[in-house]
């Protein structure tokens, strides 16, 4: 079920990959981080699984971008 939902939001992950650079991250790392982020989002908001609107995209995009920006800040501080 998680993998099916991830396929729906995978485009957001790949767009972020093109916009941001994280040292030593490969495509698989981005996908893994995206799945982990989606899992955490659905744990916090299980109602998003049943919703028919596209609210999950908005929530995921915000959560994932913030996660990537945190990783970039961490990378830059080292």
Which residues does each predicted region cover?
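Alpha-helical promoter-recognition and RNA polymerase-docking modules of transcription initiation factors
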Residues: 1-77
């Amino acid at each position: 079920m998680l993998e099916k939902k991830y396929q729906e939001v995978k485009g957001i992950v790949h767009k972020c990959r093109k916009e941001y650079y994280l040292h030593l991250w490969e495509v698989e790392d981005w996908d893994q981080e995206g799945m982990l982020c989606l899992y955490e989002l659905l744990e916090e908001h299980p109602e998003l699984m049943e919703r028919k609107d596209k609210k999950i995209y908005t929530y995921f995009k915000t959560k994932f971008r913030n996660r990537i920006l945190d990783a970039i800040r961490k990378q830059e501080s080292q």
